[in-house]
């Protein structure tokens, strides 16, 4: 009998073991679709980004007009740009839902998979930030100025570090060219890290909504979950194309229709919606270094989540108190996102400070506390 090429070929068997014959729990829900959706987001962003890069010029005098030229004169350039800009938003929607799923179902107990995931999140955030600067509009320029300036809060080396990052004494041409370089490079780094992320995941196999070992009841990934993934792709690409075609500027900042001007500061400097929660935490501390540390902690705190798991059950499926706390955290992040978009004045200042405090309290104190309490309740 001739050997099955799919199972014997050195390259094909790797693909087979990852996407075709992969043993998968039979009860994973739609919340497990977001991994593959993130893959589709990455592929879409790399494809549209490559086409945009072919028409883009990374120079302060030409960047803005080169983007305008792409939208006006390049065949379907407007569509490529709109898909790329809004694709970033969908990338973040998917990654936040993916992380939320991981938190709710205790997937963070696969420590290596979780940690590589956080590194992926940080790389994605860096990519989105440098990409936002490229069209060289007002908010691009001032966003870059404000955020890079935060590094100057680092004691002793701060100012040197910022000037080194800028390539001068302010955000200027060298900054733009290096940001373009980074924006081109980082997505491929994300693709590489994704493979590491998947390698770690396939060491243990997928978690499932019950949080129990599912080895006794696993099914092949194809055709069951491959079909389910295709449905997910359709449900992702439909709203993306709808947004890109009907309301492409809905999530953008009107300031970016004005070319960058170092002499005029916009009245309200704010990042894209997906960074607003972190921006609100940064602004809630009236001290530069303190704010920067809180900003870093708001994302890096995810590294501590596996250490703070005190429950005897893995998932929150049968833990109503933890569920309540989880949805409180979601509401809290929504409040932070809203506060980040508001001006720094009463009552937004105090709301932001309280929401920031609540964010860290829930993650660092209340989750382990409630987990321990639920264990005690189970014993009685």
From Swiss-Prot:
Cofactor notes: Binds 2 heme b groups non-covalently.
| A GO molecular-function descriptor | ubiquinol-cytochrome-c reductase activity
Show the stretches that span the lipid bilayer: 34-54, 78-99, 114-134, 179-199, 227-247, 289-309, 321-341, 348-368
What is the required cofactor set for this protein?
A: heme b
Membrane-protein topology: Multi-pass membrane protein
> What are the GO BP annotations of this UniProt entry?
mitochondrial electron transport, ubiquinol to cytochrome c
Family matches, as InterPro entries: Cyt_b/b6_C, Cyt_b/b6_C_sf, Cyt_b/b6_N, Cytb/b6-like_sf, Cytochrome_b, Cytochrome_b_C_euk/bac, Cytochrome_b_N_euk/bac, Di-haem_cyt_TM
Query: Localized where?
Result: Mitochondrion inner membrane
UniProt-annotated binding residues for heme b b562: 84, 183
Q: Where does heme b b566 bind?
A: 98, 197
Residues binding a ubiquinone:
202
Output a single Gene Ontology CC term carried by this record: mitochondrial inner membrane
The record's keywords, sorted A to Z, are: Electron transport, Heme, Iron, Membrane, Metal-binding, Mitochondrion, Mitochondrion inner membrane, Respiratory chain, Transmembrane, Transmembrane helix, Transport, Ubiquinone
On the tree of life, the source organism's domain of life is Eukaryota
Q: What family does this chain come from, according to its entry?
A: Belongs to the cytochrome b family.
Q: What is known about what this protein does? A: Component of the ubiquinol-cytochrome c reductase complex (complex III or cytochrome b-c1 complex) that is part of the mitochondrial respiratory chain. The b-c1 complex mediates electron transfer from ubiquinol to cytochrome c. Contributes to the generation of a proton gradient across the mitochondrial membrane that is then used for ATP synthesis.
Q: How does it assemble?
A: The cytochrome bc1 complex contains 11 subunits: 3 respiratory subunits (MT-CYB, CYC1 and UQCRFS1), 2 core proteins (UQCRC1 and UQCRC2) and 6 low-molecular weight proteins (UQCRH/QCR6, UQCRB/QCR7, UQCRQ/QCR8, UQCR10/QCR9, UQCR11/QCR10 and a cleavage product of UQCRFS1). This cytochrome bc1 complex then forms a dimer.
Other notes: Heme 1 (or BL or b562) is low-potential and absorbs at about 562 nm, and heme 2 (or BH or b566) is high-potential and absorbs at about 566 nm.
Question: What name has this protein been given in UniProt?
Answer: Cytochrome b
The organism encoding this protein is Eudyptes chrysocome (Western rockhopper penguin)
What lineage, starting at the top, does this entry show? Eukaryota, Metazoa, Chordata, Craniata, Vertebrata
Quote the gene name from the UniProt entry.
MT-CYB
């Amino acid at each position: 009998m001739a050997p099955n090429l799919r199972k014997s070929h050195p390259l094909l068997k790797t693909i087979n073991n990852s996407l075709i014959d992969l043993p998968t729990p039979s009860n994973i829900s739609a919340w497990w679709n977001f991994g593959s959706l993130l893959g589709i987001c990455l592929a879409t962003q790399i494809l549209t980004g490559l086409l945009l890069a072919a028409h883009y010029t990374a120079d302060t005098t030409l960047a803005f007009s080169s983007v305008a030229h792409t939208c006006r004169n390049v065949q379907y350039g407007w569509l490529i740009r709109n898909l790329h800009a809004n694709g970033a938003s969908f990338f973040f929607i998917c990654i936040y839902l993916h992380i939320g799923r991981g938190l709710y179902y205790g997937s963070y107990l696969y420590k290596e998979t979780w940690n590589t995931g956080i590194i992926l999140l940080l790389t994605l955030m860096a990519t989105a930030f440098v990409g936002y600067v490229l069209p060289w509009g007002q908010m691009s320029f001032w966003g870059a100025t404000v955020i890079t300036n935060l590094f100057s809060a680092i004691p002793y080396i701060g100012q040197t570090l910022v000037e080194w990052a800028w390539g001068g004494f302010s955000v200027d041409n060298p900054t733009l060219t290096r940001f373009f370089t980074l924006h081109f490079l980082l997505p491929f780094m994300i693709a590489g890290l994704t493979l590491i992320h998947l390698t770690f995941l396939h060491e243990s196999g997928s978690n499932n909504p019950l949080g129990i070992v599912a080895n006794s009841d696993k099914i092949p990934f194809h055709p069951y979950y491959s079909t389910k993934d295709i449905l997910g792709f359709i449900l992702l690409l439909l709203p993306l194309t709808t947004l890109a075609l009907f309301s492409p500027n809905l999530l953008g900042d009107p300031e970016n229709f004005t070319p960058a001007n170092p002499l005029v500061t916009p009245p309200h400097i704010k990042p894209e919606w997906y960074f607003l929660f972190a921006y609100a935490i940064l602004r809630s501390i009236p001290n530069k270094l303190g704010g920067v540390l809180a900003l870093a902690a708001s994302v890096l705190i995810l590294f501590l989540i596996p250490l703070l798991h005190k429950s005897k059950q893995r998932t929150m499926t049968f833990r109503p108190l933890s569920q309540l706390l989880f949805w409180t955290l979601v509401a809290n992040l929504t409040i932070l996102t809203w506060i980040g978009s508001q001006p720094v004045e009463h009552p937004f200042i105090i709301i932001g400070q309280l929401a920031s405090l609540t964010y860290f309290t829930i993650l660092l104190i209340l989750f382990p506390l409630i987990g321990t309490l639920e264990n005690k309740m189970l014993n009685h």
